[in-house]
Amino acid sequence: MTAPEVSPAALLADQMVRMRDGVRLATDVHLPAGYRPGLDAPLPVILERTPYGKAEVSRSEQIDGRLGVPRPEVARYFTAHGFAVVFQDCRGRYGSEGQFTKYLSEGPDGFDTLAWIMQQPWCNGRIGTMGLSYAAHTQMALACLNPPGLACMVLDSGGFSNGYQCGIRQSGAFELKQATWAYKQAKLSPAAQQDPLVLAALEAEDIRQWFTRMPWRPGHSPLASVPEYENYLFEQWRADTFDESWRQLGIYAEGYYDAIPDIPVALMSSWYDAYVRTTLENYAGLTQGRQSPVRLIMGPWLHGDRNTTHSGDAEFGPRAAFDGNLAQHWLGFRLAWYQRWLRDAPAGAAPDPAARLFLMGGGSGARDAQGRFDHGGAWIQA
């Protein structure tokens, strides 16, 4: 398989973009090598808003056989094809100011970020978004406000249709992955990174042991040393009935489908992911009464593991991988999407299927050399 082309790029690092409340978010702008803002023709833009560090490794990206690629390298792939690429730290994360409250600031902050991009000399007024998991949530949150310039989206494994039913709770039952996520990310928070005592307190906790010491309460949890993370976690945990708190922007896209612009959207997830219901509900909701294409991909993977051909003890075979089966590679799939919808490139000769689903089963059932069952499967399309 040919490796994606990666070329040098120009960087406008650590642009501090002001939000409506005055908080500034750290933003990196990647431009094609030699590009002259204000002199050369403006460019279509690709945006990813992330809580995981705008210049850090993206664990699911793959280039030249390397799994886990720094975001600047991902940006260089797209800038080499004539796009501007923007990576931004979410509020309260890494270089951004403000207090992190999971999910609920992403709509207004995303809207304000697109408004800022639209004012820049390197932007031609057409913006696409991308991202996995939380970076899919940030996309859906901003789309619910119909922001200026939003022209297409690629959501991978996220973008809450209804956080009470899927993603934060499952049909009302609280997902304890929210607690493990909060603990892990609290250790990377500005509070912990700037205060060795806070970091030491977090690292001294045994998160597994804490799960044997239920119930937790404020001040008596592994997050007690970082109140902003403890507070939002308990707000989610206590909200055990579906009320107005679950209809908030950022965790309830199904209440905003009519507000989301009629633009091309690609939705991808996997049968063993936490966001199956979210992805299917968003597909159903966004295909009603719209002219723009909405495309669905459902693989047999775990969360973000689009080129891993097994899940647990089930082996699905080489056809299960995204790369080489649905497209040459995931970067190339997104490039073709953005060229089509941000640059009006001609569509391919073959019609783009509305849905591509991996149908599991049909294997021999025998164990392979790794001890997994040959479950098999094949891609089908509609």
Put a short name on every predicted segment.
Residues 2-13, 17-23, 148, 231-249, ...:
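Alpha/beta-hydrolase-fold serine-hydrolase catalytic core, especially in secreted/extracellular enzymes
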Residues 21-37:
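A short loop-to-beta-strand scaffold at the N-terminal edge of the catalytic core in hydrolase folds
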Residues 36-119, 166-169, 174, 308-321:
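Cap/lid segment of the alpha/beta-hydrolase catalytic domain
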Residues 42-45, 81-84, 123-126, 148-152, ...:
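Loop/turn elements at helix/coil->beta-strand transitions in domains of secreted/extracellular proteins
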Residues 71-74, 80, 144-259:
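Accessory cap/linker subdomain of secreted extracellular hydrolases
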Residues 74, 90, 109-114, 127-129, ...:
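Extended, hydrophobic alpha-helical segments in both membrane/secreted and soluble proteins
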Residues 130, 134-205, 271, 290-335:
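A catalytic-pocket lid/entrance helix-loop region that shapes and gates access to the active site
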